[in-house]
């Protein structure tokens, strides 16, 4: 399912924490990792100066050496590798290389400070989510700063074991569900399917209509569970009332989900944020890894 993955790195402590998780993806079917480093245009502005060209060559050589060491470490763990250094806008280059290499998934990291503080998502990762037609796995880890040192605590074990799939039953949400149905091959043992009745909408409905919506939506959830059973995936269903992102994060914690898999719709995350920001808030606030699957809206 995720045989070929792309791992972009800037060699930071945060990227190294995600790198340490890559061998665990072998249980999800990963066999090959394409290691990518992007020299950002802001790092070495190109011009006609020989000095700039020389600086670019030195930076590229250094990155190639780091990638070579990383590749040897992965090969020692039984993964095949390839490496590449490119120059340009990091997010756009990551998406371009992912398409050229025909990878099945992009793996990146988000950083946080503690279980009680917001997970911070870097601009590059956010832009990749906005641009990539390929599924993106955002790994999560906690950052501890002590005595001037940065330590990243891994939280990536058994990533695909118990998957939470929030759905609004839309055509777009089918994009993620179609991936979820295939996750048994990635080691998934259970799927939790969640639908949240948005309190901002439902508070304007009469009680009898709310009861009708609950009955209809529970029937939809049970149908999805039966669909998953055809793929030999046990499933439990939850119907909640409240703010969708808040309920999703709460269920993820209560049920000890190891991954949240959901769709991002539209042509940009800005569009999604304007209609409620459920996806954006889950990605930013979740302490669990997030698998984002893009759905292009039809026009």
Residue ranges with predicted function:
Residues 85-94, 239-247:
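Charged docking surfaces used in two-component/phosphorelay signaling
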Residues 33, 81-83, 136, 191, ...:
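Hydrophobic anchor at the start of a short beta-strand
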């Amino acid at each position: 399912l995720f045989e070929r993955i792309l791992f972009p790195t800037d060699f930071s402590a945060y990227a190294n924490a995600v790198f340490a998780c890559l061998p665990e993806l072998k249980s999800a079917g990963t066999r090959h990792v394409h290691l990518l480093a992007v020299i950002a245009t802001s790092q070495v502005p190109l011009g006609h100066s020989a000095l700039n060209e020389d600086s670019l060559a030195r930076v590229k050589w250094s990155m190639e050496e780091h990638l070579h060491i990383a590749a040897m470490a992965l090969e020692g763990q039984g993964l095949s590798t390839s490496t590449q250094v490119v120059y340009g806008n990091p997010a756009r280059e990551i998406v371009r290389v992912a398409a050229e290499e025909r990878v099945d998934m992009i793996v990146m990291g988000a950083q946080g400070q503690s279980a009680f503080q917001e997970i911070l998502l870097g601009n590059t990762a956010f832009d990749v989510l906005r641009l990539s037609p390929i599924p993106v796995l955002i790994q999560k880890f906690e950052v501890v700063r002590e005595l001037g040192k940065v330590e990243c605590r891994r939280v990536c074990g058994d990533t695909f074991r118990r998957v939470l799939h929030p759905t609004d039953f839309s055509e777009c949400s089918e994009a993620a569900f179609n991936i979820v149905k295939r996750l048994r091959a990635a080691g998934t043992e259970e799927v939790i399917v969640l639908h949240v009745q948005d309190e901002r909408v439902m508070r304007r409905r009469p009680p009898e209509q709310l009861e009708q919506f609950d009955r209809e939506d529970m029937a939809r959830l049970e149908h999805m569970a039966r669909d998953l059973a055809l793929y030999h995936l046990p499933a439990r269903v939850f119907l909640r009332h409240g703010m969708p992102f808040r309920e999703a994060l709460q269920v993820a914690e209560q049920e000890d989900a190891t991954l949240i898999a959901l769709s991002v719709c539209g042509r940009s995350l800005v569009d999604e944020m304007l209609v409620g920001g459920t996806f954006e808030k889950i990605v930013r606030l979740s302490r669990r890894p997030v698998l984002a699957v893009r759905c292009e809206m039809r026009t």
